[in-house]
Amino acid sequence: MTYTGSIRCEGDTWDLASSVGATATMVAAARAMATRAANPLINDQFAEPLVRAVGVDVLTRLASGELTASDIDDPERPNASMVRMAEHHAVRTKFFDEFFMDATRAGIRQVVILASGLDSRAYRLAWPAQTVVYEIDQPQVMEFKTRTLAELGATPTADRRVVTADLRADWPTALGAAGFDPTQPTAWSAEGLLRYLPPEAQDRLLDNVTALSVPDSRFATESIRNFKPHHEERMRERMTILANRWRAYGFDLDMNELVYFGDRNEPASYLSDNGWLLTEIKSQDLLTANGFQPFEDEEVPLPDFFYVSARLQRKHRQYPAHRKPAPSWRHTACPVNELSKSAAYTMTRSDAHQASTTAPPPPGLTG
């Protein structure tokens, strides 16, 4: 099967104003908007100055309140609403904030934030003494955030340790070099991350998290059921509408070019098969619980979108007969350091992988 639809290249990199990095800035702008709400769900005092420092004009104006989410929306396209997206990110941020605080109340003092972007939890949450927070992301992202927060006079509320690594590669080695202790229970998060990874990279990441965790470790992420064809079409249409609205404000960001569609192992099932005890809540229910209207049915191409928190019970891998390995993709090389819209990212299923029943060992954890 040939799959084309992303301009992502194997090993591509970014800063906070381009490609995947720009989505981190967009999410930080949403957190700034949520912080300014009349009855805020969250308080991220660093979101607005971080967005301002990145320098994307429309996101700075949204973060500062000069523009509102409704200013961005097209009234004739209510299904592609920046207002609803801002509500979603407020609820999501609160979910992960509470996940980490619950983990520390259970005695966990080691935290790993995967793809931390402009996440400022190491500075704004009330971590107990002796808590170590590891943040992993691309070098340009981590350098920018660390420098900007230092210039703001911000001080971490935990022992913050920066890990610069690509989550598609051997990040466990870099994490270990920063002092990570695999004998201690850990609270992990993969917030807004997995759909930006190719299917095999997602599985490797979850395998690595499991291999580096002892029982009673915790993990939080989102789990999305695989797209049905008509759902994918509607999601792509919504992303295109939002991209056109962003372009009207001088911001060129099209999520269609950044996320990976196509079948993959569903994270919740994958974690359960590998010894994690799951607690799930639908996005719709979490919106309602926090005082927002749920999406109307016709708005939602992904009704099976869950927030997942998990606790590791057993430390061994399973390969149930009902679970197929993720497709193995051969990556067609893109031009080096180029994200040209004319250069599609093509992936071809490996026939050899279809006959495989055992996943390869995680990178960085081989003997």
From Swiss-Prot:
GO terms for molecular function: methyltransferase activity. Keywords: Methyltransferase, S-adenosyl-L-methionine, Transferase. Its EC number is 2.1.1.-. SUPFAM superfamilies: S-adenosyl-L-methionine-dependent methyltransferases (SSF53335). Disulfide bonds: none annotated. S-adenosyl-L-methionine binds at D137, D166, L167. GO terms for biological process: methylation. It comes from the Bacteria. Pfam families: LCM. Residues 348-367 are annotated as: Disordered. It is an enzyme of class 2 (transferase). Residues 348-358 have a biased composition (Polar residues). Exhibits S-adenosyl-L-methionine-dependent methyltransferase activity. PANTHER family: S-ADENOSYL-L-METHIONINE-DEPENDENT METHYLTRANSFERASE YKTD-RELATED (PTHR43619), S-ADENOSYL-L-METHIONINE-DEPENDENT METHYLTRANSFERASES SUPERFAMILY PROTEIN (PTHR43619:SF2). Belongs to the UPF0677 family. This is Putative S-adenosyl-L-methionine-dependent methyltransferase MRA_0734. It comes from Mycobacterium tuberculosis (strain ATCC 25177 / H37Ra).
